[in-house]
Structure formats: C-alpha cells, structure tokens
C-alpha cells in the first residue's frame, strides 16, 4: 500500500509539472460520443460535489508487458485528482473494483503541494470492501478511451470514505 501511495504521489507530481509547463491552448473538444465528459477530461461527483479534470493534465496510457496489458487513466484539477488503473486490461468491457482483485484500483486524491506528506488519498478497493465500484470501458480507438465509473474509496489514514459517482471519461491516449 505504501508503494501504491508513492506511485500515486509521483503521478500527481508529474501532472502538476505538466500543468505548469504547458501553454494555454484549448482545441474545444467534441461531444463525447455519448459519454458525459468533454474530450480530454474526467468528470464525476465526489460526495455530491462536481469534479471536472483539466484537459492538459488528463490522459490514458496502456502498456503491455509479460503478456498482460495495464491501462492507466488520470485527470486532475489544481486541488483534486482521480486515478484509475486496470491491470489485466482486455479492451471494451466492465471491470469491477473488488478486494478480491487488488490489481484494479481507483483513487481520489487531494494533493498538498506545499507538504506532500499531508496529501490525502482515498483508494478502492480497500480491506473487506467487497465489490466497491466499477470501471466500464465503452469505446476505445487508437487515440482515445471512453467510459464511465463509480466507486466508494477509503482513506487509510483516518478511515473516512468518499463516494465517487456519475463518473465518466473521454481521454486521449499518450
């Protein structure tokens, strides 16, 4: 779990560096092809509050090694992030988040840039969570991946939970 938190923190730092080094260039996006998220973004409700990632810090990336594919999807704002990892990715379909398969994870993160050790992360699945959500890939092309998601996540520091609902993504692949 400590390694996972370190990897998540590293991904957040890379995203923040990317955010500060990019120019302001908005291509407008498209209608999302039936997915609520605008092109290049992740949207969701976090305990009822709206989240929409910035296009310049949102991406999907798939890597194949050892006969297995891993899909990573990430998007963040200046103060929040959502990160989803599907190990054993096999294209369009539904991937359950359950404590029986800890190789599929989703996280909601509130980074603390001035003091990274105080970054708060809520992760799904967690111990004894059972099925706590799903990631549904509805469309994949050579350049994009689209779908929906929802999950209940837990903060291992204070045992609080965050309900991430009505999630959708329309991400460009790197």
Regions found by a protein language model. Give the residues of each.
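Short, isolated positions in well-ordered beta-strands
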Residues: 51-53
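C-terminal or internal capping secondary-structure element at the end of a domain, subdomain, or sheet
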Residues: 133-174
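Bacterial Sec-dependent N-terminal signal peptides
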Residues: 3, 17-47
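Bacterial N-terminal signal peptides that target proteins for export
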Residues: 1-9
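Surface-exposed helix/loop patches within compact recognition domains
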Residues: 42, 56-142
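Bacterial N-terminal signal peptides
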Residues: 10-18
């Amino acid at each position: 779990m400590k390694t996972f938190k370190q990897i998540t923190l590293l991904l957040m730092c890379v995203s923040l560096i990317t955010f500060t080094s990019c120019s302001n260039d908005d291509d407008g996006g498209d209608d999302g092809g039936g997915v609520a998220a605008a092109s290049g973004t992740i949207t969701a409700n976090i305990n009822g509050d709206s989240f929409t990632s910035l296009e310049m810090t949102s991406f999907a990336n798939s890597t194949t090694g050892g006969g297995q594919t891993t899909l990573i999807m990430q998007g963040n704002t200046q103060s929040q992030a959502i990160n989803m990892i599907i190990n054993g990715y096999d294209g369009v379909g539904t991937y359950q988040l359950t404590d029986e398969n800890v190789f599929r994870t989703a996280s909601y993160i509130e980074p603390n840039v001035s003091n990274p050790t105080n970054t708060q992360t809520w992760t799904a699945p967690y111990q004894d969570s059972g099925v706590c959500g799903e990631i549904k890939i509805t469309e994949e092309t050579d350049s994009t991946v689209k779908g929906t998601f929802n999950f209940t996540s837990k903060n291992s520091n204070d045992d609080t939970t965050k309900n991430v609902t009505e999630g959708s993504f329309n991400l460009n692949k790197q």
